């Protein structure tokens, strides 16, 4: 296996986060929420991209005793980024409920699908399943609260839930594995640098795809975005799951930048459903090659 040297087999024991780490988590949570606040629904925070969910799951997975810190981060982020809604009672209830969902997901992953160690297809599929269910439950709670308080019309429940779900799902699939295995970053960098030609090829592939989609082709046509699959999947075949996620992270940043800078581009929510397909495919491929 060409990327076996970037996989570890040690499951990290739970420890308490230091005050500095908690402060860093707060800053990162709010920052990720802010940069991904793109194309929201009625300024209620329902965006098609929520990278902070991956941070939340990784933090709860790696450190114990942080439920209330995470709930507070959700609450602070909502107030800072979106302001206080008409019914202010929603905010603490939403923050506590969503944190409980992610706390259970983190516990379930540690018990049944430990994220450290050699990536397997079975473990990867279980992780994807946990991420999908976590996102749909969190989405149902949030959108349900907004609907019950008449902040969202009942006939928009399903569309708002779909937007919430895909945003949370992609955040989990993309960032949680990278952050949980952050200690493996030096090994990954050495593996990448040991194959400079492959690294340059993937980098040029991402640049070429971005150029063809946003500058040459029609960014309003979703079919053009399949060009991004080629370099991302190539990274999965070369470096496994960690390499694929690095490429996917670069791709996600490119998509957000393109959507924000161009007027005529496919809706970000449609691009995120496409991104979900890529993430599931790349994670599965990276686990078996």
Predicted regions and their residues:
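Short helix-perturbing small/polar motifs within transmembrane alpha-helices
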Residues: 2-48, 52-152, 176-189, 193-222, ...
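Short aromatic-rich membrane-water interface segments that cap or initiate transmembrane helices
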Residues: 157-170
């Amino acid at each position: 296996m060409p990327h076996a040297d970037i996989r570890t087999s040690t499951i990290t024991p739970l420890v308490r986060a230091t005050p500095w780490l908690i402060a860093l988590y707060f800053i990162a949570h709010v920052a990720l929420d802010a940069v991904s606040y793109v194309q929201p629904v009625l300024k209620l925070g329902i965006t098609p991209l929520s990278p902070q969910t991956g941070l939340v799951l990784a933090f709860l997975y790696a450190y114990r005793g942080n439920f209330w810190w995470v709930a507070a981060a959700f609450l602070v982020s909502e107030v800072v980024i979106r302001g206080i809604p008409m019914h202010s009672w929603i905010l603490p209830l939403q923050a506590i409920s969503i944190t409980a969902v992610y706390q259970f997901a983190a516990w379930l992953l540690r018990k049944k699908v430990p994220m450290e160690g050699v990536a397997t297809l079975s473990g990867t599929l279980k992780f994807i399943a946990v991420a999908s269910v976590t996102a749909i439950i969190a989405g149902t709670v949030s959108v349900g609260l907004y609907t019950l308080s008449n902040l969202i019309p009942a006939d928009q429940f399903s569309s708002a839930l779909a937007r919430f779900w895909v945003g949370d799902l992609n955040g989990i699939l993309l960032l949680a594995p990278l952050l949980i295995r952050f200690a493996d970053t030096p090994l990954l960098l050495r593996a990448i640098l040991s194959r400079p030609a492959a690294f340059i090829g993937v980098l040029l592939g991402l640049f070429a795809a971005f150029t063809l989609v946003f500058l040459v082709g029609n960014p309003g046509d979703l079919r053009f975005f399949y060009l991004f699959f080629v370099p991302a999947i190539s990274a999965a075949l070369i470096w496994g799951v960690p390499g694929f996620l690095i490429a996917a992270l670069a791709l996600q940043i490119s998509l957000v930048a393109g959507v924000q800078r161009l007027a005529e581009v496919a809706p970000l929510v449609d691009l995120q459903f496409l991104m979900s397909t890529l993430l599931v495919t790349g994670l599965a491929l990276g686990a078996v090659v």
